[in-house]
A protein has these predicted regions:
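Central antiparallel beta-sheet cores of small beta-barrel/beta-sandwich binding domains
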Residues: 21-90, 98, 116-196
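Structural microenvironment flanking redox-active thiols in thiol-disulfide oxidoreductases
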Residues: 284-327, 339-346
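Short, internal strand/loop/helix patches
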Residues: 249-251, 321-359, 363
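N-proximal helix/coil linker or "cap" segments that precede and/or mark the start of modular domains
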Residues: 206-251, 263-267
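Thiol-/selenol-based redox modules, centered on thioredoxin-like
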Residues: 354-406
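Short pre-active-site segment immediately N-terminal to redox-active cysteine/selenocysteine motifs
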Residues: 268-270, 275-278, 285, 310, ...
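A short beta-strand-turn-helix
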Residues: 248-270, 293-296
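Bacterial N-terminal signal peptides
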Residues: 6-15
Length: 406
């Protein structure tokens, strides 16, 4: 009897110790950039020593590619970003660094998530679409601010021609909405202050401690206030001669040269996607391209990624290979060059400066449409509309029985 009681107690103690050492569940984290901390949620899953971590981009999860917790030592890899979390787990706290050698390592800390009751405050309603006048290096004159709101809670994204900031999430406090975003690749803090004149004052702090201030007006009032329209992503980039077939000839990861004149593309509808594994908006877009390829490849759709990587990735494309594996990419992937070579490697394009950019080729090999950037799910209805328009475009091109030599 004493033996059985002792065995039960020992089992309970072992179980309690295992639970105390378990990371499983939601955690409240911060990552430090320069002199400010960005709060975020992270979720850990654990099976034995194996650990998986997931950051959040709105409702989307950004999961790790591998990880382990051995004794107090926690190591989690996000190979598709070429980043890692290295930390100790002790006394209920995860503490260490996150980052990589190229962009640096940043102090990281997390504690078990504590659900905070919704603030008993009446927040002003700012839901909807806003226009931000801004002159960008890409030639834009305005951006969009897309806001989704539930009471005092906000999820917002700034949508540029190349894509969005990711979901900036937070609550109304002290007369302003205090928001943050961290998905392992993008780090941002934002404050949105509603003004008496109906406008919004925005402070956005991002990578390398950059602080930018903007004013936003309701999109339906922008024209009357003299605020320009945001750039149309369908008009941002064009080709010099739309009557000429779109040409490419680059090596794939095995070293084999693949060209637009290959039999593989003859008489096919082709999506040519300018991309890079360093580009967060390209990560946003990849699952949609995979979905399109899976659905329409048998009907005559080919997708070709023209990938531009930094010199070190071109020598050792481990991040790119992890990117391809992460998203289950089976369409053609070509190493086109370095980001600085974009225009030289695709000389037919005019004003090609957005990552990603997607060219839609008809069965005759000619460019039928070009879309700059990718509005991700954080952009709400703009993401829904983009997916719908792209799908309809592909179906229309596939329905055209044009067969011409390239």
């Amino acid at each position: 009897m004493k033996y059985r009681i002792g065995l039960i107690i020992s089992t309970l103690l072992i179980s309690a110790a295992a639970q105390a050492h378990s990371l499983k569940g939601l955690w409240d984290g911060t990552v430090k950039y320069d002199d400010y901390k960005i709060p975020f949620l992270i979720e850990f899953s654990q099976k034995g020593d194996a650990v998986t971590a997931a950051f959040f981009n709105g409702d989307e999860q950004v999961t790790s590619t591998g990880g382990s917790l051995i004794a107090k030592s926690l190591n989690v890899n996000f190979d598709h970003y070429a980043t890692r979390l290295t930390a100790t787990y002790e006394n209920g706290v995860v503490k260490g660094t996150y980052g990589n050698t190229r962009y640096g390592f940043h102090d990281f800390e997390a504690q078990p998530h504590k659900k905070v009751a919704a603030a008993d405050v009446k927040a002003p309603d700012i839901a909807g679409v806003w226009t931000i006048p801004n002159e960008s290096p890409k030639g834009e004159h305005a951006w969009r601010l897309v806001v989704q709101q539930s009471g005092a809670h906000l999820s917002a994204a700034i949508l540029r021609v190349d894509g969005d900031t990711g979901a900036l999430v937070g609550d109304f406090n002290g007369g302003k909405f205090q928001l943050s975003h961290f998905d392992g690749a993008r780090a941002s803090l934002a404050e949105i202050t509603p003004k008496d004149d109906g406008s919004l004052e925005i402070e956005l702090r991002g990578f390398k401690n950059s602080l930018k201030r903007f004013t936003a007006v309701r999109a339906d009032q922008a024209k009357s206030k003299g605020v320009p329209e945001p750039t149309d992503p369908e008009e941002h980039t064009r080709v010099k001669d739309p009557n000429e077939p779109f040409q490419f000839s680059f090596a794939d990861l095995s070293g084999k040269t693949v060209s637009n004149t290959d039999e593989q593309f003859r008489g096919k509808v082709v999506i040519v996607n300018v991309t890079g594994s360093w580009c967060p908006n390209c990560h946003d877009e990849a699952p949609f391209l995979v979905e399109l390829y899976r659905k329409y490849h048998a009907q005559g759709l080919e997708i070709v990624a023209l990938d531009f990587e930094e010199p070190e990735q071109r020598k050792d494309p481990t991040r790119l290979q992890a990117f391809i594996k992460k998203y289950g990419i089976h369409y053609t992937y070509l190493l086109a060059g370095e980001p600085s070579e974009l225009q030289a490697k695709i000389p037919q394009a005019v004003n090609l400066n957005s990552w990603p950019t997607t060219f839609f080729l008809g069965r005759d090999g000619k460019v039928r449409a070009i879309h700059a950037g990718f509005a991700a799910p954080a952009s709400g209805d703009f993401n829904v509309a983009l997916k719908k328009e792209t799908t309809e475009r592909i179906e229309k091109l596939l329905s055209e029985n044009v067969r011409a030599s390239r």
